[in-house]
Amino acid sequence: MASSLAAQLSQIAAKSTNQLDLKAQRIAHSQSLIFDRKVASIQDFDTVYQICYEGFQELCQLDSRFTAFERTIFSEQSKAEDRTQLTAAQNKELDVALEAFLALVGGRLLLNPAIKAVEWLVRRFRIHEYNTSFTILTFLPYYTTPLFLNLLAILPEDLTPTFKVLIPYKKSSINPPRHPLVHSATTNKPFLAALNSYVLQVSRQQAHHHALLAFWAGVYTEAVAGMLDASRSGRREIEKQKHEDIVISVLPILNDGFAMKNVSELIIGCYMVSVVLAQKASLQDKVLDSLMEAVAGSWTEETVESGLVCLAVLAQQKPETKLPRRALKAILRLDDIFKRLTELATQYKTSHLLLGVVAGCLDDLPRQKDTARLDLLSQIFQNQLLGEPEMSKAMALVLEATSSVHKDGAMSLDAQARLADLVQVFSQSESLRPTFQKTIAESSFDIAALEHNLQTVIDTAPAPRTVEDVEMEDVEKEEEQDHFSSTVESLSGEKLFKGSFLSTQSIPLFEKLAQAFTLAIGSKEKCQTFSDLAALGKNEAEKSPQYLSFFIRVFSGPYSMGTRVTALNMITSFLTSTESTNLDFQALLPFLLVTLTDPSERVRREAAAALAAVGSLYKKNRKGEDIWARDNLYGQPKDIKWLPTRDAQKVFERAVLPSLEECIFDATHIGKVLENTLRGVSVDANASELKKPLRLAFFTFLCSHAIELPLFTPKLGLLNILNRIDKAGGTTRTKELEPLLKTWRGFSEREVQDICEKERVPVSDVERQMVAIVTPKEKDSIMILLSNVSSHSESLRPSFIAAVFGRIKDIWARVAEDRQTVAAEQLFDISLGLSDLPLVNNSRDLLRSVQLPGSVLAQFLERIPVSLTDMEALGPAPKRRRTSQNNMIAMTVKDEAEFGKVMEKMTFILELVDSSSPETHPELADGLFQTLAALHHFKSQIQSGMSYLLSLTLGSLLAIVNRSKESAKAQFDTSVIRADLVVDCVRTTESPQVQNAALLLVAGLSVIAPELVLHSVMPIFTFMGSSVLRKDDDYSVSVIDQTIDQVVPALIQSLRDQKRDVVSGTSELLLSFTAAFEHIPSHRRLRLFHALITKLGTQDFLFAVLAMLANRYAMDKDVLVLMTGLVSDASAPVELTTYSKFLGLVSDSLKPKPGISQVLLGIGSDDGREPQKVAVDLLRDLAYLFKHSSLKVKMAKTFASEDEEAIRQLRSTFSQILEQVLTIGDSVQSMKLVSQANGDVLAALFGTLTLVDFLDTIEVLLERPNDELRRKVLRLLEGRLRQNPERDSASQIRVLDFLPTLVDIIRNSTDILLKHAAVACIDRIAEKYGKKDPSRVIGAAQVVASEACIGQTDDRIRIMGVLCLASMAETLGQVMIPALPEALSRSLALLELSLEEGKENSRLHDAVFSLFSALFVHIPYMISGPHLDKILLLSFKSANAEECEDDSRQEALKMMARKVDMAATLGAVDRNWQYAVQAGPVATKETLEVVSLAVEKHPKSATGKNIGVLSSILFKAFDLRREQLALGANATFDAADVDETEDALNDVTIKMIYKLNDTTFRPIFTKMLDWATSGLPKKDTQGSLARLTAFYKFLQVFFGTLQSIVTGYASYIIESVVSVLGKASPADKSTKALWLATMRLLRNAFEHDQDEFWQSPSHLNQISTPLINQLAHATNSSTAATVIAEAVPAITELAVAADSTDNHKELNTALMKFLRPSAGPNGKPAGGENPHTRLAALKAEQSLTEQLGEEWLALLPEMLPYISELMEDEDENVEREVRKWVKQIENVLGEKLDDMLT
């Protein structure tokens, strides 16, 4: 304790800065860089400052940046600074200044002024103590100088671990050598991190210097190299992980370094580190690409040479030659690039870099604007910068680019000429020709296609010489032979490959074999040697896929033409030589069909030969259906839709073989053949048509291969063929191949690149073919494509998105217009997203590039007013003609970002319209005028000209109008024209373009619609309607007010003086105002119209204004709001009078010769609307006014007043209105829409009444003879009661008083629909008011249950009545009992009727069961046993009725099980069980569900009381299996049904057991055992087996569920189980189920033994031997699998339960019998004679070893002899498994068994 305290005190003392410690202060003051300690100790700060300040001033003269420190650390005040007295914040601020100075002075430390200046920092601010790290790093580049020794001398003794490398040299006072510093950087992470951080900080401060950066670059490069070398490990995974950790730590430093382009030496240092990383670490392509882009992006003129060297080194490490795009662009932008590359190539390895440049020069040839890249390409080849192998690759790149250039677009003539010249150089140059000819020979380029693309002739390699000519090549051939021999020898040890070579993309063995096969090309002997390799399994080729799948992969893969031809030849040879004529080789068909599209004729010829060989095999095949490689062609079994052999033969003989000759000469012919074949058209004269089912099968066969094929080269070829076929045999390409598209979509960019790189297929080709899966003939083709990108856009590859949109563009024109509309809407919504997303840009580009239908453009235009409405509260009403536009209130758009989005959206829409030839879409006129109105309105709000948008809008309108002028009649509805807006555009805009467009548009409009532009018959109101009314400035408002006040009264008076009808006389005036409605600012509309009507006279004119507005705008929301406001201002009598006149106008409009309606509404005029449509609009608006005006409130107030006259007048007018409505209803019964609208008015009119008044009115109306009216009013009553009717006492009493009226209708009416309506009303009344006085409702219930209602023959009244009774049962409860007898009997009869065959009625069925459910819930005690029996019998019948839904029946049965007394429920089930079984599985399972619920939901006591009937049901159910077997072919249950039923039964039984105690259940169990074992005569073997199976399946659940609680019950069944084990067998179909049940029940019984039951010898001895003897059943692969799966786990669990060495030994002894062949007592083979038996025994030993471990291996000595024998077993499977067992034993014991086994 004391020593610890002393140590702590000494540490505190060492760090103390107590000012009283004078000795410590003197020592600290004497620390100096330039003075001796003694001299320094006697100097004061004034002296030191004077000396140091001189040095500082000299520094300032050298670099003006130092002057900034004159005011801080070199100020006069600094002499008094004491760091010990400063706060932490002040010290931190001081540290910033000190470090900035040190960074700046670091490059001049060898100068005396700099040392003097730093001396001040040491003496005054003690930087060596407080800023130790920064100080050391500043001096470190000078580690070899005396100056660094001086620094070491004054550094603190306790240096941090970061700088521990300096401690020995500080103590020894010597300069550190370089090696320790590099070693420290390599091994001491903090030191390296500090150095890197310091260098980056100094560089950012622009204080870098040569000494520092040279030191850092050397140390850091060596450190990184050292770290990578030190991380090398024998285990590749560990080494890779360590390398990744180092790379992750280095990359951020490089990233920061590359960002400082102007620090050249830092950049070069980063290049050095990058080179080390590339050479010593296995960097991924992605990392290399990023480094190369960073290097190329960082160089300047000073660093470009070093950067190119770095790029060359990095490129050499890349497996592929392609350079990153940014790096390539940076290279190509360099001046004198060829000169630079030439100089680079003379000093460094540049082959990959140059190949990358070559590939880059060839990239995207059609889009190259000039030939600069091709010029560079020519220079590279002509100066032969590449070696021969790389030259060949470069030539191949040129040829490949030239071959595929036509796919990407046309090449410019200059580019074509340059490439042609270059290829001519290849073929004519003496030095390049051999390489070029070799390249041609080893590749599969189509020379004819090359010549066509380049428009030149290519001299290919000469024909190979004969063997006699080749004498000088013997040595080379021998070397090749040696290479082949060594390769084959290395492969000779390979065992047969497990599976198919087509199973996955990456198979190392395949690569080795392919290399060997390539070496064998050209030599039959070598090919024969190669084909005999064990890994290929030629001898097993007919049974296993290895041999043929290898050659399939070769000829389908990216190999040279010769290699592929030889592979095809090997397959053909095999097919022609095979002796098995019953094999079906249809698996070859997809690959060979793809090969027929190969550009090489040689390849196609060999493919045709192979197909012919397959065809000949089909002819020999007489009976075989054995498809080669059916389950393992692609590894694990795949969902391949194989063709039946005869169908495959038909495909060959009718479609493929007749066209082979043409396919050889034409690579495209096979595509045409398949297309026509699958369409059902014969393309060849010798071919015959395939029937539709076969076409479908063939098509799905090919599609399934395309989906499941793991290799993308043949997959791409197959897609290329399939994508020609839209439909086949009733299915579509999209439907079949869409899973492939979804799978491809899910790949990441890296995965796609890896896939395509491995198989050398262009990513773009795969992307294009994948999206081409979607055919335009698919109904939702575009939406399918969009669904693949829209919801996953952030995670998808840009290339996939581009391909999808490219496909949409390709198929757009072939898609139906309605589908284009839906797609365009979605594309537009996508295009409004963030503009930098690929999905958004692609959507916009697509919309701009396709032909959009007019309907789509119209919908887009509709969005503009809506968008502007969202931006500000004063939005224009869409789709309405305006007549004025001013008087807007200025507003400010607060959200500028939102405004920008709206502007962008509008601009995009209008640009789309403008670019879509608007003159061809006259229907856009309406939307464009709306847009013009919205823009003009919004323009005034934001005080902006919006000239561009106006110009676009006017331009589109002008195009439409000009096109319309050319025809006799306008091509669009001229009523949408807004000439006032166009004029205002001229008046208000400052843009000449807009003005000119507007003037031209006005001129055009005057031609096609002069009445809208020129003066009308009432100039003043025309002017107001088209101009003034829409203004919103004060002056315009004043004009309107004065006009109304002065002109209108005079006009009215004039009409009266002339004795003209004032309403008809002012129709033009009213029309002007109503026409101007939508142009009037919304906040002024009500005030303006109210003033107008007031001046005209409300009682005389209100109806007319309302009618004209309704006629013109129908149900426009804004108009309805105005109309409601106008009528709400009127009194109740005036409002009712207005409605009466309004209805009179409706009646007039429907007359043959209309009167006033012709004047006001234009009825009967040439341009007037149809009277019925006018009537519908007027009636709908009137219904709205009744519902939403304040009439009801005003009438209530009048009725509540004491003004009798007013009340009388009101009732009179209301009655008149009602009479008018009824009269109209009578007259328009034949006019459906008018009648419906009139009915709405009637309903709304009644809605103005209280419920009491409503019922009073209905009673009167029900006395009318019109049944339609009576039905109508009852439906209105039901609707009102369905909502929230009045609940006051008076209303309730009145409603209940109304019940007798409804009952009377049900009893006496013959109109079924009227009865239906009455029952519906009773239903509502009973639900809403029944509980108020149930006794008044019961009478109605009895009538509904009687003959008069549900006793009718009409199903509608029956269903309504039954549902009404169900509602009443829920509401009335036991009060319902008087109606119950008749209700039950009739409903059961109805249910039975609804289930009659041919007369099924699901609605009636469901209604009756709903009634039963209600009765079971609310009065279950009233349902008697016979009723329950009847319900169950009918439910059984319902279960089998296909037309009936299950839900209602099942719900009723559940309610019965839950609510009805358990004894009654179980009794009914027991009585009717046999009928349930007769009905079938569904009824039986539902019956068991009833029992299950009854047991579950009732208490234990109820279960105990009813155990007798419950047992009876269970025994009957357990006997189901036996009964069904006895029925034989007449059985109603199949095996699966029986199993499912028994599962449900076992569940019920377990639930019952949970409710019983052991005393109650044990007798039942013994009874069950007796029932199962001895309950049948011995002769009934089949029945006994069935009962045992059912019982044992129950025991399996019994022991598995109740576990250790019931282990003791096993004593009852041991004898029976042993007996069963002696006679049941998994190989015997009749006993297999029993055997499986036995194994599983034993396993469960053993597994849960916690009472040592099975340890008892009496129990163990009985069961062990019979159980282990089950291994003898393993006599073939099928039974062995069953035994291993079922018996082995049971044996294992028995051993675990036995849990004693003696027991284990006994078990093992019995088990080992089966490990070796032996003879039984009767001389017959026994034990392990069969290898499958031995295998099963081995599996048991493995399981026991795994489960018991060392406990079981205590028996190892007696096992060893068996193991030794088994390791030499003649059966491979046994031998393999015993070796697994040996490894397992060795893992458990931790030692080898080799010594024990020898």
Curated annotation (Swiss-Prot):
Keywords: Membrane, Nucleus, Repeat, Ribonucleoprotein, Ribosome biogenesis, rRNA processing, Transmembrane, Transmembrane helix. InterPro entries: ARM-like, ARM-type_fold, BP28_C_dom, HEAT, HEAT_type_2, HEAT_Utp10/HEAT1, U3snoRNP10_N, UTP10. One of its GO terms (biological process) is positive regulation of transcription by RNA polymerase I. Coiled coil: none annotated. One of its GO terms (molecular function) is snoRNA binding. One of its GO terms (cellular component) is membrane. It is found in: Nucleus, Nucleolus; Membrane. The keyword Nucleus applies. PROSITE patterns: HEAT_REPEAT. HEAT repeats lie at residues 583-620, 1042-1079, 1249-1286, 1293-1331, 1754-1791. Its main location: nucleus. It is a multi-pass membrane protein. The keyword Translocase does not apply. Pfam families: BP28CT, HEAT, HEAT_HEATR1, U3snoRNP10. The chain crosses the membrane at residues 942-962, 998-1018. It comes from the Eukaryota. Involved in nucleolar processing of pre-18S ribosomal RNA. Involved in ribosome biosynthesis. Component of the ribosomal small subunit (SSU) processome. Belongs to the HEATR1/UTP10 family. This is U3 small nucleolar RNA-associated protein 10. It comes from Aspergillus fumigatus (strain ATCC MYA-4609 / CBS 101355 / FGSC A1100 / Af293) (Neosartorya fumigata).
